[in-house]
Amino acid sequence: MAAAATMAAAARELVLRAGTSDMEEEEGPLAGGPGLQEPLQLGELDITSDEFILDEVDVHIQANLEDELVKEALKTGVDLRHYSKQVELELQQIEQKSIRDYIQESENIASLHNQITACDAVLERMEQMLGAFQSDLSSISSEIRTLQEQSGAMNIRLRNRQAVRGKLGELVDGLVVPSALVTAILEAPVTEPRFLEQLQELDAKAAAVREQEARGTAACADVRGVLDRLRVKAVTKIREFILQKIYSFRKPMTNYQIPQTALLKYRFFYQFLLGNERATAKEIRDEYVETLSKIYLSYYRSYLGRLMKVQYEEVAEKDDLMGVEDTAKKGFFSKPSLRSRNTIFTLGTRGSVISPTELEAPILVPHTAQRGEQRYPFEALFRSQHYALLDNSCREYLFICEFFVVSGPAAHDLFHAVMGRTLSMTLKHLDSYLADCYDAIAVFLCIHIVLRFRNIAAKRDVPALDRYWEQVLALLWPRFELILEMNVQSVRSTDPQRLGGLDTRPHYITRRYAEFSSALVSINQTIPNERTMQLLGQLQVEVENFVLRVAAEFSSRKEQLVFLINNYDMMLGVLMERAADDSKEVESFQQLLNARTQEFIEELLSPPFGGLVAFVKEAEALIERGQAERLRGEEARVTQLIRGFGSSWKSSVESLSQDVMRSFTNFRNGTSIIQGALTQLIQLYHRFHRVLSQPQLRALPARAELINIHHLMVELKKHKPNF
């Protein structure tokens, strides 16, 4: 098969070569015709050349054998020579047809050739034009860059010139003195707005000239003389104006707040002096300090003197202590006269002085109070005095800071230069008064007034009085503690045997303590202080010991208990009116009262029902120990107890109720004690019933005589007092 394929390929190659030779002969006449191209030079096509690579030929043959036409020809057994002739003929026909088509389209082809040539010429000219345009663009771009560089340089020069112009303009404006400024400074009154405006302009120009002189600017010499003369004139006019305002403070009955308000409108005047004439500024400040210092001192000295004239005529003395014997005979409901005792131990309405409404109320006017014959306790005078001091000090401090342009330590120093003498005088007056003051409530109220005024000053952002408040408290606290300790000592050293006749009603010393303690506790609750509570605790211990010492003077335990209950109840009632229910004082006296009340009820039930109480306790003890059989020997005793209770319980309860109501001054407390005694009696009789229900006593004939427990309760309710 391979040999046949090789032979077929060789035959086909020979046919092609022969056809090519024939075509060359036929095309010979046309080849020499005009306008035709030379025949193709195909080179050497001899397949027998040694240079032909057989392997490659074999590959081509194999590839041709894969052709469908070749496969079909080999399959049908077509004669290859005939087939090649047929193919050659077809190729010649196609070639002739192509030549004829080419000849027919030769004009069009020539026209197309001319058009292409013309287009080439046009494109060449366009290329030349675009080249020239590109060259022009390159030149323009270079020019634009040059212009940009020139523009940037011009902008820099412009900015520099503008900066120089601005600096020069500022310099010239700062140095030039306009005529309006000269006219206003020389001719206008200081109170006119234009004088203030031009004064600010003059201050700015003077500052600018000083700055330029420091830089060595020669032009400053031209205006220095004019500015100096204007400055001297302005300083003179300002000095006269401010000193005149300060001197107006000295006029009698002058409200110095009005000149201060006027000065604040022209506070720039002092700033101008401070920056341009410090000697004059110091002169004005010193004159202000000297004038206001004397005015405040004179005012407060006079006010204090007149204020103390409306104090209560009778005040507490060193003998007006809690434990000092009250020589005056007093009834049960009586209390020390307000005029004679000045409410030493009672608070009353005095506590209102620290209420928000009273604390910042208008100050007292002494001559008005004198005309109305009104009198006040010391704490009211103290509040009025220090509220005036607080209000004026706050206003003065703020004025100093704003007008004299000071703050911090400098403001404190200037404030104390103005108010120092007044504050010292006030402290000396307070120290002198406290030396003979024995009214602890007044001193304690003054302490709380100071604490509240200190908070008000802090809210107003006026720290200048902080040191003064500390000094006042340093005077008040030791005196308060001393008075409290004196009262403690007076109670401790009181001898009950020297107090006269004994009485089971509340003692006047315990009443004093109750009023005094409730007053201090109620005040202290607003701003708690541990030291105060410690001192009150000491006083409470001494009062409790005093009550026990007095109770020991009674011969019977019943009277002792009545005295203790009356005093504890009174102290508890007074404390609960002002102190909180959970305060230590209230809880302490409540426990003491409950304990003594329970003991008194047992003491009260003992005479009429003592036998019943003793039997019930003994029987319950036997039952608890399992010795109930021993109750069989108590039948006679039980019978006697049943019959005795049935015959006497009503009269005993009636007597008991009357005894209680006679013994206790507080009807509510007496009612509570009666109720407690009857309740305990019912419980006792109920326990007696349970004992009699034991098997050992169940068959006792006297059990039929027992009073029904419900009937007893109904009857006892009739003896409950109603108020």
Swiss-Prot record:
Modified residues (Phosphoserine): 355
Membrane-spanning ranges: none
Modification N-acetylalanine, positions: 2
Pfam families from the UniProt entry: Vps52_C (PF20655), Vps52_CC (PF04129)
GO MF entries: syntaxin binding
Described function: Acts as a component of the GARP complex that is involved in retrograde transport from early and late endosomes to the trans-Golgi network (TGN). The GARP complex is required for the maintenance of the cycling of mannose 6-phosphate receptors between the TGN and endosomes, this cycling is necessary for proper lysosomal sorting of acid hydrolases such as CTSD. Acts as a component of the EARP complex that is involved in endocytic recycling. The EARP complex associates with Rab4-positive endosomes and promotes recycling of internalized transferrin receptor (TFRC) to the plasma membrane.
Family: Belongs to the VPS52 family.
Entry protein name: Vacuolar protein sorting-associated protein 52 homolog
